[in-house]
C-alpha cells in the first residue's frame, strides 16, 4: 500500500508541476503578447527611489494592470523587477505586461514637457522642441516647413510661424516632430473663438492678418494693459495708410534681436520690414498669446499714432509726430546721468 501511496503522491506532484508550468507559460505569453494598446492615455507617476511594488500599485490604480501582485510576480519571474526609471509616464490602456515592464526599465513613455512662452518665434521653438523630443533640429525644422502639413491644417502661410500656440505641452515617448507640431496648432485652433471669426468680417481682415498683428503686439508689449493701446496705434496707421514702422518686424527680418534698431537694420530688404513696406507683414513674426490676439481684434478707442518705450517697460503714446519727438527727447533726457 505504501508503494501505491508513494506513486499517487508522485503523480500528484507531477500534475501540480505541469499545471504550474502551464500557468507560468500562459502568464508569460499573455504578459508578452496579450492586449493591444487601446483607450485613453493616462498619466502615472513613479517617485524617485520607488520599488517595483510601488510602481505596480501605481499602474493598478491607473487601471493599466488588473492585478498588481501578479504583475510584480511576472516581473520577478522574468528577472526584471529592478532598476526602474522614476518620472511621470504617459501610458495607454491595453498595453501588455511585457511592454509595461520594458517601459518602466527603459523610461519609455516618460512624459516630456515643453513650455512655449508668448512671443517665441520658430527660431526659439524649433531647437527647444528638438531637445524635448530628443530628435535632430533639422527634423523639427522640416515639420514646421512641411507644406503638406500646412495645407492639411488649412493655414494660409508657407510655415507654421505664429500658429504654434504658446502653452505648456506634454509629449509621450517617441512623439514625432510632425505629431508635436500638429498638437500645437490644434491648441491654437482650440483657443480661437467663433465670435473672433465674426469680428474679422467687421474689421475686413483675414485671420492671418490678425495673427500677424497680434504677434507684433506680443513683441512690443511689456505691460498687459498696454496691449489694446499698442494694437490701436497699428490699426490707426493701417487705416490712414501709414507704414507700421514696427521694430520687431525689422528684427525678425534680419534674424537678430538688437536692443536698438539701427539705420542699417532699417534698410534691410525684406517683405517683413514694415519701415520699407506698407501694411502688415506677410505673416506672423512670433506666436502670440490669447491676450494679444484679443488686443489685435479689439483695439482700444484712442487716436494715437506713435509710441516710444520707457526704460521701465511702459510706453508713451502720442497722436502727432511733434508730440512723439518731444516724448522721445524727454525720455532721452531723463536717462542722462545727473551732474
Where are these predicted regions, by residue range?
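N-terminal type II signal-anchor transmembrane helix
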Residues: 2-41
Amino acid at each position: 500500500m505504501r508503494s501505491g501511496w508513494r506513486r499517487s503522491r508522485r503523480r500528484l506532484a507531477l500534475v501540480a508541476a505541469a499545471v504550474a508550468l502551464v500557468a507560468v507559460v500562459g502568464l508569460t505569453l499573455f504578459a508578452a503578447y496579450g492586449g493591444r494598446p487601446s483607450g485613453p492615455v493616462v498619466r502615472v507617476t513613479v517617485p524617485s527611489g520607488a520599488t517595483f511594488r510601488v510602481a505596480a500599485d501605481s499602474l493598478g490604480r491607473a487601471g493599466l494592470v488588473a492585478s498588481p501582485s501578479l504583475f510584480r510576480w511576472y516581473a520577478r519571474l522574468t528577472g526584471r523587477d529592478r532598476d526602474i526609471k522614476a518620472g511621470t509616464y504617459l501610458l495607454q490602456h491595453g498595453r501588455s505586461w511585457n511592454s509595461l515592464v520594458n517601459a518602466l526599465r527603459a523610461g519609455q513613455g516618460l512624459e516630456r514637457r515643453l513650455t512655449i512662452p508668448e512671443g517665441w518665434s520658430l527660431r526659439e521653438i524649433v531647437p527647444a522642441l528638438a531637445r524635448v523630443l530628443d530628435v535632430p533640429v533639422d527634423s523639427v525644422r522640416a515639420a514646421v516647413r512641411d507644406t503638406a502639413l500646412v495645407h492639411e491644417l488649412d493655414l494660409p502661410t508657407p510655415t507654421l510661424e505664429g500658429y504654434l500656440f504658446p502653452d505648456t505641452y506634454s509629449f509621450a515617448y517617441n512623439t514625432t516632430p510632425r505629431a508635436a507640431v500638429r498638437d500645437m496648432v490644434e491648441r491654437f485652433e482650440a483657443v480661437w473663438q467663433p465670435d473672433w471669426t465674426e469680428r474679422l468680417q467687421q474689421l475686413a481682415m483675414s485671420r492671418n492678418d490678425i495673427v500677424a498683428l497680434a504677434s507684433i503686439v506680443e513683441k512690443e508689449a511689456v505691460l498687459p494693459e498696454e496691449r489694446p493701446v499698442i494694437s490701436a496705434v497699428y490699426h490707426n496707421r493701417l487705416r490712414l495708410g501709414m507704414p507700421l514702422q514696427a521694430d520687431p518686424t525689422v528684427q525678425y527680418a534680419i534674424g537678430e534681436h538688437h536692443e536698438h534698431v539701427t539705420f542699417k537694420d532699417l534698410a534691410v530688404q525684406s517683405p517683413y520690414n514694415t519701415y520699407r513696406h506698407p501694411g502688415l507683414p506677410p505673416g506672423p513674426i512670433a506666436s502670440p498669446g490669447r491676450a494679444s490676439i484679443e488686443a489685435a481684434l479689439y483695439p482700444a478707442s484712442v487716436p494715437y499714432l506713435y509710441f516710444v518705450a520707457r526704460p521701465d517697460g511702459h510706453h508713451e503714446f502720442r497722436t502727432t509726430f511733434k508730440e512723439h519727438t518731444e516724448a522721445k527727447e524727454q525720455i532721452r533726457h531723463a536717462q542722462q546721468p545727473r551732474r
